[in-house]
Amino acid sequence: MRGLATHPAARGLADDCAVLDLGSESLVLTHDTLVEGIHFLPGQDPADVAWKLVATNLSDLAAKGAEPLGVLLGYQLGTDDPRFVAGLDEVLSHYGVSLLGGDTVGAAGPQVLGLTALGRATHRPVPSRAGSRHGDRIWITGPVGAALLGLEALQAGDGESTAYRRPQALLAQGWALAPFVTAMMDVSDGLLLDASRMALASCVTFAIEQASVPIATPEARRDDALRWGDDYQLLFTLPGNHESPVPANCIGIVHERGPAPLLLDGKPPSGKLGYEH
Amino acid sequence: MRGLATHPAARGLADDCAVLDLGSESLVLTHDTLVEGIHFLPGQDPADVAWKLVATNLSDLAAKGAEPLGVLLGYQLGTDDPRFVAGLDEVLSHYGVSLLGGDTVGAAGPQVLGLTALGRATHRPVPSRAGSRHGDRIWITGPVGAALLGLEALQAGDGESTAYRRPQALLAQGWALAPFVTAMMDVSDGLLLDASRMALASCVTFAIEQASVPIATPEARRDDALRWGDDYQLLFTLPGNHESPVPANCIGIVHERGPAPLLLDGKPPSGKLGYEH
């Protein structure tokens, strides 16, 4: 968050979620904005947009091992509001989450949709990006690249696009993992970029073996899959001798901090690592 | 919130704030969106916009007697982001509130800014709009119409515009009032409209005496002052024999529900009561 992140009060903006202790509970809070033409396609089904808006915020809670308490919506009226409401209904029911409040505005220009999700931590300390240690192993809950294929199918008007349109928030996996992980985050902007961020936050170097990363694309597009976002798998580290309590793939190991935060098959990857905001 | 308000999960949208019990605490949550050209003037000082965005949400918390815990910001980049940050810093420092998180997006079109404010109730049950009873007296914490004069001064480029640019959230008043009020809300959309909403929510009729309403405008503009918004005074009802624990003016009494929710000097007011979203 340019400019704002330098503000002493704005430290929370560097991470996806804020954690706030309140009485006997720890609250986990996240806010994301989707903009038409940037985060979703103009003309995309508003029901899918509603799904994505909610699911991506819940995914942030999943990465904190948090149980959702509800969401607040900042809704800019669009071309088919009833269809948005239908999708909102579907995603809220699917995750058993309440719409606690929000507001509606009319405005010209691309549709801007904001959502705040609120959860309670199921385990404390709440996992962050900053706990990976030398000797940990790096894990991911499932393949990357499915959303990339889904977007291409949607743009082509042909083929399976669910992974792009209706991402899943891995809440149950996050709850199961929270007591054991040394660090955790959801992969929203590309595996290489997000892994690099986690390594930087933890002051370590991540060494990832390309071939061990599960991908949803053909092998020829492995590199795209590792740099594409929107899959919302959980990326986490566990002490070296721990197995994952949920199905997951070990994709590398954590070293002491070297010259580069990320090594791919032993070398710093070149080019764009993912989707930079 | 058209469409959404009919959703069973969307009941919270009918009120300004959501209240959520969590452990030993009650959380109070509100989300408001400001749109350039609708809620603030194009070209208005971004520092003032930041102030208003935060203060209006904190005002919602004030009306619930809630103590702010922090805010989350959905920020669409504008023409002078450092100036926005300066105003944000100022308002957060003024109220001692933390920026917990949020995100930044770039988009064409008018600037859309969303803010979620989170607080903890200082008194339970948390005051709502729906508790006014026959025999209560109706109170307001201060004059209406100052923001109207401020807007006019700002548009004219001459005169005192602080009341419009930098509204105050009456947090201390809200905390002091919460244990005693039968209903409370902040006046954001015009006194007559908001009073009518409170009466409807409480299933009663409010009888307001025009002359007893404190106004910041000349007497000739009393009618404007009663219908204009943006002043963020607290409107509340107390049992008939109670005096207000904070400086406030008694402006009327509560009757059993009659044919109209609101009477002004004994008659239902005609015309537009305030700012309808």
Model region roles, listed by residue range:
Chain A
Residues 1-55, 59:
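N-terminal glycine-rich phosphate/pyrophosphate-binding loops that anchor nucleotide-derived ligands
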Residues 7-9, 17-18, 89, 100-106, ...:
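A generic local secondary-structure boundary/capping motif
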Residues 10-12, 20-23, 64, 105-110, ...:
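Solvent-exposed alpha-helices and their adjacent loops that cap or buttress functional pockets
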Residues 23-27, 34, 67-150:
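Glycine-rich anion-binding loops of enzyme active sites
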Residues 46-70, 83-94, 172, 176, ...:
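Small-aliphatic-rich amphipathic alpha-helix that forms the alpha element of a beta-alpha
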Residues 77-100, 105-113, 118-121, 179-180, ...:
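Glycine-/charge-enriched secondary-structure boundary and capping motifs
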Residues 133-142, 166-191:
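Internal active-site segments that recognize and position negatively charged phosphoryl groups
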Residues 146-166:
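Short, compositionally biased
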